[in-house]
Amino acid sequence: MNEQYSALRSNVSMLGKVLGETIKDALGEHILERVETIRKLSKSSRAGNDANRQELLTTLQNLSNDELLPVARAFSQFLNLANTAEQYHSISPKGEAASNPEVIARTLRKLKNQPELSEDTIKKAVESLSLELVLTAHPTEITRRTLIHKMVEVNACLKQLDNKDIADYEHNQLMRRLRQLIAQSWHTDEIRKLRPSPVDEAKWGFAVVENSLWQGVPNYLRELNEQLEENLGYKLPVEFVPVRFTSWMGGDRDGNPNVTADITRHVLLLSRWKATDLFLKDIQVLVSELSMVEATPELLALVGEEGAAEPYRYLMKNLRSRLMATQAWLEARLKGEELPKPEGLLTQNEELWEPLYACYQSLQACGMGIIANGDLLDTLRHVKCFGVPLVRIDIRQESTRHTEALGELTRYLGIGDYESWSEADKQAFLIRELNSKRPLLPRNWQPSAETREVLDTCQVIAEAPQGSIAAYVISMAKTPSDVLAVHLLLKEAGIGFAMPVAPLFETLDDLNNANDVMTQLLNIDWYRGLIQGKQMVMIGYSDSAKDAGVMAASWAQYQAQDALIKTCEKAGIELTLFHGRGGSIGRGGAPAHAALLSQPPGSLKGGLRVTEQGEMIRFKYGLPEITVSSLSLYTGAILEANLLPPPEPKESWRRIMDELSVISCDLYRGYVRENKDFVPYFRSATPEQELGKLPLGSRPAKRRPTGGVESLRAIPWIFAWTQNRLMLPAWLGAGTALQKVVEDGKQSELEAMCRDWPFFSTRLGMLEMVFAKADLWLAEYYDQRLVDKALWPLGKELRNLQEEDIKVVLAIANDSHLMADLPWIAESIQLRNIYTDPLNVLQAELLHRSRQAEKEGQEPDPRVEQALMVTIAGIAAGMRNTG
């Protein structure tokens, strides 16, 4: 194990040294000495030296305003470099990569060794694999794109330096390049000056496709194919591509007034433009590669006399011209010009697939399989995975917006006020209108701007090429009418096909009612006819945890999924559960493999659809090699969950979970909702107010400008508590509930649940990870610097709760210390703490100075504001998850 870390440690210290030289060159010896002193104090403070901890606090409190920014930047940049080294380590031959693509091989061997599974059953499970990753622009991706590109290049240098056979001069060149990249990063402002627009966010998503996924997906499929051939003697069919990408960037308007129908239209065009751009590069390669002459009669008939001399090239050149014409038309549309559609405009994937596949079949038939299975096969797989739209988009809107639009319409028509009708009356009206042949919307009606926006969005969906929009997600869905309302609005827009509409159940009550809502819908004949045996339902992780605490939320999510699976199975409906997980624990994030195997049996039968958020996209798909390893992990987990489903929990375990859920929810809400000191404490002990100033995402931090915790979005709520290291949303209530059940004499049952029930062991594992990242002396320091003395007892109470929680979790898991079974993660947290701690101390100091100045009516000092932003970004990098 330790040799594995020594390679990582030596890279981290080498990058740290280069950063130190850069700082010295830029700002002089004295700043570097100051940074080094702080680093050494932090290291010995972590090792338990209290005198040095005190000295660390004093040193950071005494920094002048001029020293604040360089010190904050030094530690923040160091953490970015450490993350880069760690990301490289996960794919390097000396690190974990030695074992990663092995995931699929290990899974296949495990499945083959099960007497009850035939090879045929395993093949069928492989062929029904379906994985859809939904990229969302959560404001949690704090790092600017400029710096991400530099870090990708640092990664490439580390890879080359690992090569034992490089000559000395090459080694020196690489070290010079590393110094240049680190100097460039140092002299670049790491904080965005302006909030990104939704279009900027979409471009960030396209950059991930271009820089990583475009190469990563075909590589993953080659890996999968090799493992299948080796273990099952089975080859993947050419057209089989189990992975798809969808995006919320430019489509998610829930609580984001900046995402309008025009923006969605623009992003759809931009996405198609980017697809033509990437396919043109592919086809250019094929034009030069496919110079072969021999072809099948079918192919020769396709190209005619004109193309007989070089049939493959002829087809590729034709395709190239169509792509160029399509690109030119899209470019004009993006500039706002209205042009007639050109001859041969590409709008459907089949138009790309057919000529490419004709070449593939001919090459195979003429004994040139080795050529067919090269770049041509990769391009065919690009068509299946990305196609004409590149990434499809989801539209997401809050349910009340549809209700208000229909209310305005019914009032105008003089048939009453839809908003005040009972659920039964709403349903009767909607079903009647859905069955009606006449339009409902009057021609000369002038609706309000809000309603106009809802109708325009439906218009965009109706006009978009079929297949470019994946689903319409309704957030805060509560009733069957919420789903029927969207179907009616889409029908009125003239949509010519059945668009998947997915209700998102995201509060504790809504999760508990989800099965009832879906049962009612499935009992409506019109609805059953429309959905053609398929239904998507989205499960909200972050809002339910914010509403009820993690323990109650995770049990409600489990039960809702369990009930929906059984209901749909009984009704003969194929259910796709769409998981809205975040990167952080309070928003449902967990290591993929563990998370998938902890879901109810049968939950992955309809495939996996999951959101990949903000900074997690970069950690999981930032490089082609990491993409291969992330997709392999998902593949292994889905196969295992479908073929070796976890056992149904025992009735007594369900009863214990019900009990834990009630106790933890009461305690959580007792603090968050009912304790009058809680909101003032939260506002002062965390940088919550200051976070709103960060130009992070395009979406406001609050759903409504005023109000308490409930109006705050789940992301800033979690982000704020991660900054002050109390990590409160990810544990509050859970440990207390466990302690109560232990006191009732059920510890041995809890231990059995931990051993034999993946759902429960994953929950405890996630709590351990949160406790490993939390830090009570830092949380206490924030209180001392920032919180009114009258509120100190509340902070102390919360910290004591966490200490008790850690003890009970370790007792149930039978561990002597946190993260005992995941030493790699424990090591990674320890490595970063030395650099994150000074940023936390500094942040508390900066918040103190900034709030003090505000109290005294002074203008905020820009040096303090800038340094504060840097600490926020740095701590986010140190915690490896933000919101």
UniProtKB/Swiss-Prot annotation:
Disulfide bonds: none
Signal peptide range in chain numbering: none
InterPro entries given in the database record: PEP_COase, PEP_COase_bac/pln-type, PEP_COase_Lys_AS, PEPCASE_His_AS, Pyrv/PenolPyrv_kinase-like_dom
Key words of the record: Carbon dioxide fixation, Lyase, Magnesium
Cofactors: Mg(2+)
GO BP term, example: oxaloacetate metabolic process
A Pfam family per the record: PEPcase
Catalysed transformations (reactions): oxaloacetate + phosphate = phosphoenolpyruvate + hydrogencarbonate
Physiological role: Forms oxaloacetate, a four-carbon dicarboxylic acid source for the tricarboxylic acid cycle.
HAMAP family cross-referenced by the UniProt entry: PEPcase_type1
Protein name: Phosphoenolpyruvate carboxylase
Species this chain originates from: Shigella flexneri serotype 5b (strain 8401)
